[in-house]
Amino acid sequence: MRVLVAGASGYIGRHVVAELVRRGHQVVVLLRRAPDANLASFLDGARPCLTPTLGDAALAASAGRIGSVDAVVSCIAASSGRPAEAWAVDHDMNQALLRLATRLGARHFQLLSALCVQRPVLAFQRAKHAFEQALADASIDHSIIRPTAFFKSLAGQIERIRHNKPFLLFGQGPGPACVPISETDLAGFMADVLADDRRWNRTLATGGPGPAVTPHERGEMLFALAGKPSRFRRIPLSLVRSVGCGLAGAGRVSRRAADGAEFARIAYFYATEPMLVADPKSGQPSAAATPRCGRDTLAEFYARTWRKGLDGQRLGDAALFERRS
């Protein structure tokens, strides 16, 4: 299969490219700039196609260099939760990629989305959901992949524990559970779906093979690795809400404040919402209803990262809790 991958420089996209190449597919990757040595190691065997942006004009100009393809895989995502960026990237750029897929004769369009889109209340979730709907309504075959939580998203407090700081928890109780998945397991799942037309034209959620874990349990795992007694510090959810409300008021006259209010809403969402598939009967998040795949566990990831550091994991919003010198 000849596959075009967008978002190949990202955390998941690079692993998707490596997995597709490993399986013998011909892979073309859209890049804004030539890859550095680290990225190039993941893209070995793929053919790069440089384009300054993923807008319609730039993609149309690149179509001749790309050539015909059997499938397009989109791993693009906004790098922040800013509403304007989310709609520009998660919606508009994906729409441009969908039009390019038709131009290139692709039979299939695979979208890397996110499980949180099952209840879209934030701007970036609504942008993703709007494109999911557009893709489902398009004439091309499709698959929409909704992973739970990435290991790297749960790595932000490792350095806090290493530097004798308490593990931060929001609100009371153990916190919302998730069934996280590694980048390699997710890449394998996406490649499996791409090769199996029985799984096309569906929205497929997946987590990793391990059990559902809460923030409190993740903290206990890290303190055990450190050989230290557990120490937790709780941040009141009322504080997050009040910050968001204050910024929302100021956001009527300030774009920066409006973005800050959205970040507060994002923090509140992830502090309270389990990343689990909703049970079809009750509608409530359910570990039992969450599909699983792969081999990598969070415990193994934490143990390896504790020994070797966060190589390749210091990405995006996971930096929220990272220690800065």
Please describe what each predicted stretch is.
Residues V3-H25, V29:
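N-terminal Rossmann NAD(P)H-binding glycine-rich loop of SDR-like oxidoreductase domains
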Residues I12, V72, L186, M190, ...:
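Non-catalytic, hydrophobic alpha-helical segments
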Residues A78-N164:
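Glycine-/Pro-rich loop/turn segments that contact NAD(P) or position catalytic residues
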Residues S238-S325:
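A hydrophobic C-terminal alpha-helical subdomain
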